[in-house]
Curated annotation (Swiss-Prot):
One Pfam entry name: Aminotran_5
Cofactor: pyridoxal 5'-phosphate
Subunit structure: Homodimer.
Name the record gives this protein: Phosphoserine aminotransferase
Species this protein is from: Bordetella avium (strain 197N)
Length: 376
């Protein structure tokens, strides 16, 4: 029986070959007689798994040696606290700046305020007119000329792909241009991690929950410049102190072993697809197909300004919201799952991450056409 197409925003679809390999190795990993779930996190088998995952990720993202790669717990929401506990006091005055472009950067800003002075450097929380497009709040990105970054800030945080709103940064700023060359950029890249080339060297720290593009829920990837480590607040738990985690190669405490193993399988799958460059081409083709149909239709509408539309998360609304339930019921019957939009914005959302093939997006477009034919 064919599997349905899963458009969940996260946890999301994994490559089928990864699931098959994990299933085949479930009871006996490489002749060890053990499942990965049964291994000691300090035993040689898991050390090999963890180190290989780190090496593959470093290769895929061109991560220099002066950056540490850490596999942690807590998800992106946890990192909203762990980042300030590690970085906000590094320059004495606990202060950090935020670019607020949606739900997740709003939560990051609010959480950091518990640990210091968290100020908004730029925001898209208001409606604007851009090139004749009337844009609702959080459907656009503030131009760099409007950013106000304090030179004394410990870091500047942005969410480079807002999963709920479907807003994506296509490039990251050079903070020297704002007169803040000593302010490192912190990026929440959770929902477009490994979907396109990302220049880690433009950041001081990058984090990503794996459950969207890079594995199952339970492991969070943190990539941090080593010179930023070792300056955690005294209230930071030792297990969340980046200096401790990096020094022990993600094994300071018991890490999420099985999640790291599956993430490692995903990294090998990404390499087999031609790396992030190969996936970028595939993701662009999928996004072009879906946005192309939505834009041509008078029945559906994507609210995001075209210049900052996400390739990963595509929100859309029907012209008649009373049809929402019928749309979702019909979609599920057609084998198209998890298309309901986030409760904070409503409507629909198709998350078309790396593991979603073009055929899945084509199946969605075919359904969109048929539903419009019946109800338009």
């Amino acid at each position: 029986m064919a599997r349905p197409w899963n458009f969940s925003a996260g946890p999301s679809a994994l490559p089928e070959s990864v699931l098959q390999q994990a299933a085949a190795e479930m009871l006996d990993w490489h002749g060890s007689g053990m499942s990965v779930m049964e291994m000691s996190h300090r035993g040689r088998q898991f050390v090999q798994i963890c180190d290989e995952a780190e090496a593959d990720l470093r290769e895929l993202m061109n991560v220099p040696a002066d950056y540490a790669i850490m596999f942690m717990q807590g998800g992106g929401l946890g990192e909203n606290a762990i980042v300030p506990m590690n970085l906000i006091g590094r320059r004495g005055l606990p202060a950090a700046d935020f670019v607020v472009t949606g739900h997740w950067s709003t939560r990051s800003h609010k959480e950091a305020g518990r640990y210091g002075d968290a100020q908004i450097a730029a925001s898209s929380a208001q409606a604007v007119n851009i090139d004749g497009h009337e844009q609702r709040p959080f459907t656009w990105v503030p131009p760099l000329s409007d950013w106000r970054v304090r030179p004394e800030a410990a870091y500047l945080h942005l969410c480079s792909n807002e999963t709920i709103g479907g807003v994506e940064f296509t490039e990251w700023p050079d903070l020297a241009a704002f007169g803040a060359p000593d302010v490192p950029l912190v990026v929440d890249a959770s929902s477009h991690f490994l979907s396109r080339p990302l220049d880690v060297t433009r950041t001081g720290l990058l984090f990503a929950g794996a459950q969207k593009n890079a594995g199952p829920a339970g492991v969070t990837v943190v990539i941090a410049r080593r010179d930023l480590l070792g300056k955690a607040l005294s209230i930071c738990p030792s297990a969340f102190d980046y200096a401790n985690v990096a020094a022990e190669h993600s094994r300071y405490n018991t890490p999420p072993t099985f999640a790291i193993y599956v993430a490692g399988l995903v990294y090998k799958w990404v390499k087999a697809q031609g790396g992030v460059q190969g996936l970028e081409a595939a993701n662009k083709a999928k996004a072009d197909l879906l946005y192309g149909y939505l834009d041509a239709s008078g029945f559906y509408r994507n609210p995001v300004h075209p210049a900052v539309r996400s390739r990963m998360n595509v929100p859309f609304v029907l012209h008649d919201e009373s049809l929402n339930d019928a749309f979702l019921k019909g979609a599920e019957a057609a084998g198209l799952l998890a298309l309901k939009g986030h409760k904070s914005v409503g409507g629909m959302r198709a998350s078309i991450y790396n593991a979603m093939p073009l055929a899945g997006v084509q199946a969605l477009v075919d359904y969109l056409k048929e539903f419009e034919r019946l109800h338009g």
